[in-house]
C-alpha cells in the first residue's frame, strides 16, 4: 500500500524462493505454534524430531533453548536463533497476540554483544547499502514516527494534560528502567550497578532538569522487579509506571538515558540525544553517547564502525527482520506491517475503555464480539438498562448500541451522561443476508451517531467533510473500486444473474426497494418512506422512462416488510426483477432513483447517475442529484474520496475464520472467493437447517 512496499516485498520473496529447503528441528512446541511459521521460515521444512535435521531452531537465548543448542552442537548442526521483531504486534505475546515479524539470526542474536550477530554483520556492511534501500528506510522511519509505532502498540498516547506536555515545563530527562530477568541486560554487559551509575550520572549531568524514570507497570504492582524504583524516590525525580506509547513519551522529553532497552533506539528515531550505559545493538556506531568501557574494545576488534541512524534502521528493520502480511498471512514487508499496525492501533484507541452492550441477542453478541477483540477494549454484555444502573461504572465506560440505539438505551445514556457508541453492518458485508443469520465481515462503530441517521452528523459524515485524503487513499480507493466492480461485489452478494435485459431506447431507471421499517428510512427519508410512494413519484417525474423495480432481498425472502403487490408494481414499473442480483440490474440501468438504499452508492462506483429522494450518507457531496438539501455537507468530493471515507476509514473488517482484523482489500478478496464458490446457488432462501448450523458455528467461534 505504501510507495515502496510492492517492490520490497517482491525482493524479499524472490530471495526466499532461491533458498534450498532443509529440515529444521524445532524442539519448542511454542515456536511451532506460531501462526504462519512456515511462511516466516521458507527455507525450512519444520520437524518435531531431530532424526533428519539439517538445522536446529530455537528462541533467542532463553534457558529453554539449552536443549536445542546442545543438540545442534552434538550433531554439528547450525543453530538458528529467532526473536520477536522490532514491530511485533498490536498486543502482548502473553495476551495471545501473534508476531507479525521475527528476526532470524544464524550467527548469534542481536542483544548478545558478547559475540557477533547477523545484525552486527549487516550494519558493518551498511556502508555499501543501495540508495534505494536507504530511501525505503527513510520512508519507513517517517511512517513509524507518524503513527507512533513500537514493538507493541496497545498503550495509550501520553495524555493531553500530562505535565510532560506542558509548554512551560523545564528541561526534561528520561531515564529508562528495565526489569530483572531481561536478557538484554545480562548479555549487554550490564547489571544492577550499571543502572545505579546511569541514574546518578543523569542527576549529576542535569542539575536543573526534571528527571523522569520510566519503569514497567508490573513493577509498582509487585509482579516484576525493576532496578530504579527505590532510587526514584529522590528529589526532582518522577516515576512513570503507567503504560504509555513509547513514541509519544519520547517526543515529549529532551534527553534520554538507557542501559540496553529498545526504547533507546526509538529515542534516536525521535531525534533525542541518547546516552547508553550498556551494550545494546545500536551502541558503538557513533549515533549515541556510549559510556560502557567495552565499546572501545568492540571498535578495536572491528565489531563497530561509524554508521548513521538510517543505516542502522535499514539493517535492523529491513534486512534483519522478516515480516508477514497480517491481512493475508502470506510473506509480507515492513510496510505491510506498518500499514496494518497503524490501522489496528487507531481501532484500539477508538475502542479503549469499558463498553457495555445492552440487551443484545446471543446472535448479535456473537457477531459483535470479534470486532471488539483488541487489547484495550473491555467488552461486557448486560441484559437491560435496569441492570446497568446497578453497576459501578469506570471513568472510561461507554454504552454500545446496535443501529441508532433503542430509545430506552439512548435515554439512559443521556440521563447518566454516559457516552454512546453505535454499531451497524459495514458496506462490504457478506455472501448472504443478515436476516438469514450470515455473519458480517465488516462493522462500523460510530462515536457521533450512525451513518444512516441524517438528522445528526455521524463519524462517516465527519470523515467525508474533514479528512485529509492522501495518495495512499487514492490508490487504495481506485483498487477497491476496480475489485468491486469487476467482480460484481455488493453488500450481500445474493440473487441470480438471470435477468431479462430491457430492449428499449428509453432511459432505463432502476428503483431499488427497501425494508420499509428500516432505520435508514426512518432517520434519512422524511418525505418518502414507502416503496410504493417512491415508485409512484419516480414515474410521475419520469413519465417516458423504462422503470425497473427491484424489491429488497430481505423482503423477497420473507424476513422483512416492504412488499408491493405485482398489480401495484405494474402500475408504475415496466419490469419487476424479484430474484435478480442487484448488480445485474445496475448493468442495464442508466439512472438509479432511491430513498436511501446502498444501491445508490454501488451505482456511483459503476459510474451511474443517482437521484436521491432521501438523505443517504453519499448524498450532498456533489456526486448525486438530491431532492432534499443538507447544508452541513458543504464539501465537494471526488468519487475516490467518497470510496476512501466509506470503505477504508469508517468500517472495521475481520477474517470470517480467524476473526483477526483485515483491511478492505482483503475483505473484498474473501467475498470474491466466497461468491465464486456459491455462484450456482442464489442464496436468497437459506434453509432452516443451514441457518441453525451457521449460527452454531458463529457462536462457537466467538465464545470458545
UniProtKB/Swiss-Prot annotation:
GO CC terms, sorted: plasma membrane
Membrane topology listed for this record: Peripheral membrane protein
Keywords from the UniProt entry: Cell inner membrane, Cell membrane, Membrane, Polysaccharide transport, Sugar transport, Transport
Annotated GO biological process: polysaccharide biosynthetic process; polysaccharide transport
Database matches in InterPro entries: Capsule_polysaccharide_synth
Subcellular location: Cell inner membrane
Pfam family, one: Capsule_synth
Purpose: Involved in the phospholipid modification of the capsular polysaccharide, a strong requirement for its translocation to the cell surface.
Record-given protein name: Capsule polysaccharide modification protein LipA
Originating species: Neisseria meningitidis serogroup B (strain ATCC BAA-335 / MC58)
Amino acid at each position: 500500500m505504501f510507495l515502496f512496499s510492492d517492490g520490497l516485498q517482491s525482493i524479499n520473496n524472490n530471495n526466499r524462493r532461491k533458498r534450498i529447503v532443509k529440515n529444521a528441528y524445532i524442539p519448542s512446541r511454542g515456536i511451532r505454534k506460531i501462526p504462519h511459521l512456515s511462511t516466516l521460515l521458507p527455507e525450512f521444512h519444520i520437524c518435531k524430531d531431530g532424526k533428519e535435521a539439517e538445522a536446529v531452531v530455537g528462541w533467542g537465548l532463553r534457558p529453554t533453548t539449552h536443549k536445542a543448542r546442545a543438540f545442534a552442537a552434538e550433531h554439528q548442526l547450525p543453530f538458528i536463533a529467532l526473536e520477536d521483531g522490532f514491530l511485533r504486534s498490536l498486543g502482548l505475546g502473553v495476551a495471545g497476540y501473534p508476531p507479525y515479524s521475527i528476526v532470524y539470526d544464524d550467527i548469534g542474536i542481536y542483544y548478545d554483544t558478547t559475540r557477533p550477530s547477523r545484525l552486527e554483520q549487516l550494519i558493518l556492511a551498511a556502508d555499501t547499502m543501495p540508495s534505494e534501500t536507504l530511501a525505503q528506510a527513510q520512508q519507513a522511519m517517517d511512517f513509524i514516527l507518524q503513527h507512533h509505532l513500537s514493538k507493541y502498540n496497545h498503550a495509550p498516547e501520553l495524555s493531553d494534560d500530562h505535565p510532560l506536555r506542558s509548554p512551560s515545563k523545564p528541561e526534561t530527562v528520561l531515564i529508562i528502567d528495565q526489569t530483572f530477568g531481561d536478557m538484554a541486560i545480562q548479555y549487554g554487559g550490564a547489571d544492577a550497578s550499571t543502572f545505579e551509575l546511569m541514574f546518578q550520572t543523569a542527576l549529576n549531568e542535569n542539575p536543573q532538569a526534571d528527571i523522569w524514570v520510566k519503569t514497567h507497570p508490573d513493577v509498582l504492582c509487585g509482579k516484576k522487579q525493576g532496578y530504579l524504583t527505590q532510587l526514584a524516590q529522590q528529589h526532582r525525580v518522577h516515576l512513570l509506571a503507567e503504560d504509555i506509547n513509547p513514541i509519544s513519551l519520547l517526543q515529549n522529553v529532551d534527553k534520554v538515558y538507557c542501559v540496553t532497552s529498545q526504547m533507546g533506539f526509538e529515542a534516536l528515531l525521535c531525534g533525542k540525544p541518547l546516552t547508553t550505559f550498556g551494550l545494546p545493538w545500536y551502541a558503538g556506531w557513533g549515533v549515541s553517547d556510549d559510556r560502557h568501557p567495552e565499546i572501545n574494545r568492540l571498535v578495536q576488534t572491528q565489531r563497530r564502525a561509524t554508521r548513521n541512524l538510517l543505516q542502522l534502521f535499514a539493517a535492523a528493520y529491513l534486512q534483519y527482520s522478516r515480516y508477514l502480511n497480517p491481512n493475508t498471512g502470506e510473506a509480507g514487508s515492513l510496510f505491510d506491517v506498518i500499514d496494518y499496525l497503524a490501522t489496528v492501533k487507531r481501532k484500539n484507541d477508538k475502542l479503549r475503555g469499558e463498553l457495555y452492550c445492552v440487551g443484545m441477542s446471543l446472535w448479535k453478541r456473537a457477531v459483535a464480539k470479534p470486532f471488539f477483540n483488541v487489547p484495550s477494549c473491555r467488552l461486557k454484555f448486560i441484559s437491560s438498562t435496569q441492570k446497568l444502573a446497578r453497576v459501578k461504572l469506570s471513568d472510561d465506560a461507554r454504552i454500545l448500541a446496535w443501529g441508532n440505539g433503542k430509545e430506552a438505551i439512548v435515554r439512559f445514556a443521556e440521563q447518566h451522561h454516559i457516552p454512546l457508541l453505535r454499531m451497524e453492518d459495514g458496506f462490504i458485508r457478506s455472501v448472504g443476508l443478515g436476516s438469514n443469520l450470515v455473519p458480517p465481515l465488516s462493522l462500523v462503530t460510530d462515536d457521533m451517531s450512525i451513518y444512516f441517521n441524517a438528522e445528526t452528523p455521524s463519524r462517516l459524515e465527519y470523515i467525508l467533510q474533514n479528512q485529509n485524503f492522501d495518495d495512499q487513499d487514492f490508490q487504495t480507493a481506485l483498487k477497491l473500486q476496480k475489485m468491486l466492480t469487476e467482480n460484481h461485489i455488493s453488500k450481500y452478494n445474493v440473487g441470480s444473474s438471470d435477468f431479462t435485459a430491457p430492449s428499449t431506447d428509453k432511459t432505463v431507471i432502476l428503483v431499488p426497494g427497501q425494508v420499509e421499517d428500516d432505520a435508514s428510512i426512518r432517520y434519512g427519508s422524511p418525505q418518502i418512506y414507502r416503496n410504493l410512494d417512491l415508485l409512484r413519484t419516480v414515474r410521475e417525474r419520469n413519465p417516458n422512462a423504462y422503470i425497473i423495480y427491484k424489491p429488497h432481498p430481505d423482503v423477497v425472502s420473507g424476513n422483512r416488510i416492504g412488499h408491493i403487490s405485482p398489480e401495484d408494481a405494474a402500475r408504475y414499473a415496466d419490469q419487476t426483477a424479484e430474484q435478480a442480483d442487484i448488480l445485474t440490474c445496475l448493468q442495464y440501468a442508466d439512472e438509479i432513483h432511491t430513498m436511501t438504499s446502498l444501491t445508490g452508492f454501488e451505482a456511483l462506483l459503476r459510474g451511474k447517475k443517482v437521484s436521491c429522494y432521501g438523505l443517504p450518507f453519499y448524498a450532498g457531496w456533489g456526486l448525486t442529484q438530491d431532492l432534499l438539501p443538507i447544508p452541513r455537507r458543504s464539501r465537494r468530493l471526488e468519487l475516490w474520496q467518497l470510496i476512501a471515507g466509506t470503505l477504508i476509514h469508517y468500517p472495521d473488517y475481520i477474517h470470517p475464520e480467524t476473526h483477526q482484523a483485515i483491511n478492505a482489500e482483503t475483505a473484498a478478496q474473501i467475498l470474491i472467493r466466497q461468491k465464486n464458490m456459491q455462484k450456482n446457488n442464489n442464496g436468497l432462501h437459506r434453509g432452516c437447517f443451514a441457518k441453525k448450523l451457521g449460527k452454531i458455528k458463529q457462536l462457537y467461534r466467538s465464545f470458545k
